[in-house]
Amino acid sequence: MYRSHTCGELRPAHAGQEVTLAGWVHRRRDHGDLIFIDLRDRYGITQVVFNSANAAAHAVAETVRSEYVLQVRGKVRIRPAEAVNPDIATGEIEVDAFEAQVLNPARTPPIYIAKEAGEDESVRLKYRYLDLRRERMQRNLILRHRVVKFIRDFLDAEGFIEIETPILIKSTPEGARDYLVPSRLHPGKFYALPQSPQQLKQLLMVAGYDKYFQIARCFRDEDQRADRQPEFTQLDMEMSFVDQEDVINLIERLFTELCRTVTPHKRLLTPFRRLTYAEAMERYGSDKPDLRYDLELVNLSDVLAETPFQVFRSVLAVGGQVKGIRVPGCGHFSRKQIDELTEVARSGGAKGLAWAVVPTDGGDVRSSFAKNLAPGEFDALAQRMGAQPGDLLLIVADRPVVVAASLDKLRRKLADLLQLADPDTLCFAWVVDFPLVEWNEEEQRWDAVHHPFTSPKDEDLHLLATDPGKVRAKAYDLILNGYEAGGGSIRIHRRDVQQQVFSLLGIGEEKAQAQFGHMLEAFEYGAPPHGGIAPGIDRLVMILADEPTIREVMAFPKTQQAVDLMTNAPSPVDERQLKELHIRIVED
């Protein structure tokens, strides 16, 4: 028996018992006749005392170093009052060792295990098996386990069936890039790794499995950002005979109970707020706004419709917008700070940032633009924005898409600077009534906002042929603290409607049959009305764990360049393997 107890288990009630522990040497303190070793496993830390009176055990303790794997036998005893450590669960006891054995020595680790030392992330990822020994990483992975377990238990109680869908599927290159897998048995043909089980879960609805879920691994070959990975995990769900409200109500119950159970220290705001897509874009410049703070966008276009200020006037003349954000009490910002905010706005596409400080003493306005306005225009602008003395007003004039992107970035930056977003608050919301399609100016075509299987609203079906841009989708996104937590929709379940949407997206009958023929045929055999959603597990756990990226809540993530530094994947393969797959590498 390697251990009778874990390193986080022993308490004063165990005093006098002989125990066997095994773990890693966390810290070692040599006081000559007494050597103290903090022995660690994933359950906690126990202090072990080696007395020179037990010469053999003491001799072993003299040789061990950090991260040695050690087995110890000894007797539990109560620590002296002055030696109690309130920072660990076992802090009232220690183990007096009478026997010890090194199970495996260890080289000096390239990273500190006992504490965060600010190493470059590349070092942490290269030695991930060491990084995962740290308390922070263990805490994150245990939280992830608890989240997934809660979801499984909740959905099982709701009558859902967990069904695994294939990892090797057909490539349908309509969204992000697929990861392709060559077939040895079928030369020149390829499987794709699933970007999501979307089509398969809809086919399960046709098959009669009316409540399906899966903790699904998904793959997308796309450019990486802080919250993206080439492979990720989502809670994939689908239900038959449901409408939008049925899905929303179930998910709201799931996440409310999940957060209250798994992260009870967090303040969960309920009921979940609800915004239309148009409202979210108008008020926040984003379809995933962080609603823990205000800083709403204010439309000033009508107030400035007749302005003589050429910068605003020229933008409005070509259908642009002028919008602003009021930053309460921040009129004291320095010019350097305002210049930094200007760069943030420019990162969203804005050509610049107009600013003004509302005077506190009835004096002149300090501003980059107010002197160019007509008499009374600044007062009207300030009134529209609800400005108070000492407020800072920030304004962008440009095309609506640029105004939205710039002010969204500005809003998030201000919240960060002013510490407006409480990390212990969870603010979920639903964004609904998305457009079904959006115009792709570069390709001169309509693209699906979500995916081509999203159902149009019944009352907008007649617009598909005449005014597609006005068609609203039966789509709903769950957002959390400024992130998209999950996207869902009611799906198309009739072949004629699906073909009409394919046609709108430029997918002709021949192409539709080649790529989606299995779906179209299935719809002819009694497909029920159905819908679902797919919340991201990685992102949810990232937010619950207060981590900056999903890499901190995944066991073995890739870098932002999609490289596994630990195993050096991707890597070359030998010529024999390529030949078996009928593949030849062609140099650029």
From Swiss-Prot:
It is an enzyme of class 6 (ligase). Keywords: Aminoacyl-tRNA synthetase, ATP-binding, Cytoplasm, Ligase, Nucleotide-binding, Protein biosynthesis. ATP binds at residues 220-222, 229, 484, 536-539. The keyword ATP-binding applies. It catalyses: tRNA(Asx) + L-aspartate + ATP = L-aspartyl-tRNA(Asx) + AMP + diphosphate. Residues 198-201 are annotated as: Aspartate. InterPro entries: Aa-tRNA-synt_II (IPR004364), aa-tRNA-synth_II (IPR006195), aa-tRNA-synth_II/BPL/LPL (IPR045864), Asp-tRNA-ligase_1 (IPR004524), Asp-tRNA-ligase_1_N (IPR047089), Asp/Asn-tRNA-synth_IIb (IPR002312), AspRS_core (IPR047090), GAD-like_sf (IPR004115). One of its GO terms (molecular function) is ATP binding. It holds the Pfam family GAD. The record marks 31 as: Important for tRNA non-discrimination. One of its GO terms (cellular component) is cytoplasm. It is found in: Cytoplasm. Gene3D superfamilies: Bira Bifunctional Protein, Domain 2, GAD-like domain, Nucleic acid-binding proteins. Its EC number is 6.1.1.23. L-aspartate binds at residues 174, 220, 450, 491. GO terms for biological process: aspartyl-tRNA aminoacylation. Aspartyl-tRNA synthetase with relaxed tRNA specificity since it is able to aspartylate not only its cognate tRNA(Asp) but also tRNA(Asn). Reaction proceeds in two steps: L-aspartate is first activated by ATP to form Asp-AMP and then transferred to the acceptor end of tRNA(Asp/Asn). Homodimer. HAMAP family: Asp_tRNA_synth_type1 (MF_00044). Belongs to the class-II aminoacyl-tRNA synthetase family. Type 1 subfamily. This is Aspartate--tRNA(Asp/Asn) ligase.
